[in-house]
């Protein structure tokens, strides 16, 4: 609804302002350059550019991003008064999103390190380190993440939950319209079930507005641009790899053990 859309936009923008203000005014402690220099000297055998995302992984990301923008625009532009035949574009983008997610599940399961993106108790030391750095404390020798920082993994978890709900409800809602793919049958569920389906779909859509705002914000932050560039060009520098990652948790080509993905 209009109220929920504005609430999501307001919450997202307030988060951006609060976080940006915090990063400017706080004593947020950065990684030690001296420590990184020592690591780089000890890992000269690694290539200068290290692959972070394969072409197929990047293609999935941008296809998903494009379909997500189409879904959000076709969902909320009519609410603000922009009239067009949005239903067809909406369910078509939904099918593209669904297809990209299915591809990603297969690709991540059989061709990548499946467990590297998940969050668990093992990540508590890393979380504590990030909190200490946020309060300006130097944490020499602190644990570093593997391929994906904790923030990325938490965001992935949120997108997964929201995405599965929005896809499940969206496919069900296709039975309410004429798509030419499934036969229209609004009687497959009772009215209360349809109501819950629409509410769930709408809430997840509004939630995605906030998630997309946060994603774009962090992608454009100066200290995160190295991650954003990797999603465009596929590689990161050896220095960024050693500064932000633990080679024992994400081994790359040229190290003693390699990790697929």
Regions found by a protein language model. Give the residues of each.
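Membrane-embedded alpha-helical bundles that constitute the cytochrome b-like, heme-associated redox core
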Residues: 1-261
């Amino acid at each position: 609804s209009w109220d929920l859309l504005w609430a999501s936009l307001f919450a997202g923008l307030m988060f951006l302002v609060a976080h940006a203000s915090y990063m400017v005014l706080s004593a947020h402690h950065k990684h030690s350059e001296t420590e990184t220099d020592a690591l780089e000297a000890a890992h000269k055998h690694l290539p200068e550019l290290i692959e972070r995302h394969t072409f197929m992984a990047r293609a999935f990301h941008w296809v998903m991003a494009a379909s997500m923008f189409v879904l959000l625009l076709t969902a909320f532009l009519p609410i603000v008064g922009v009239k067009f035949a949005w239903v067809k574009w909406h369910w078509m983008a939904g099918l593209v999103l669904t297809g990209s997610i299915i591809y990603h599940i297969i690709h991540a399961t059989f061709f990548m390190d499946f467990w590297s993106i998940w969050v668990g108790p093992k990540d508590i030391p890393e979380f504590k380190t990030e909190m200490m750095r946020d309060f300006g404390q130097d944490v020499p020798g602190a644990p570093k993440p593997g391929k994906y920082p904790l923030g990325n993994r938490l965001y992935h978890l949120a997108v997964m939950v929201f995405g599965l709900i929005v896809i499940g409800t969206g496919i069900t809602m296709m039975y309410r319209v004429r798509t030419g793919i499934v036969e229209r049958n609004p009687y497959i569920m009772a009215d209360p079930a349809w109501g819950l389906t629409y509410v769930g779909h709408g809430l997840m859509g509004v939630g995605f507005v906030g998630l997309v705002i946060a994603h774009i914000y962090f992608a454009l932050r100066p200290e995160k641009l190295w991650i954003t560039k990797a999603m465009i060009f596929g590689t990161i520098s050896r220095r960024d790899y050693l500064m932000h990652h633990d080679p024992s948790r994400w081994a790359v080509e040229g190290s003693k053990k390699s990790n697929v993905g």
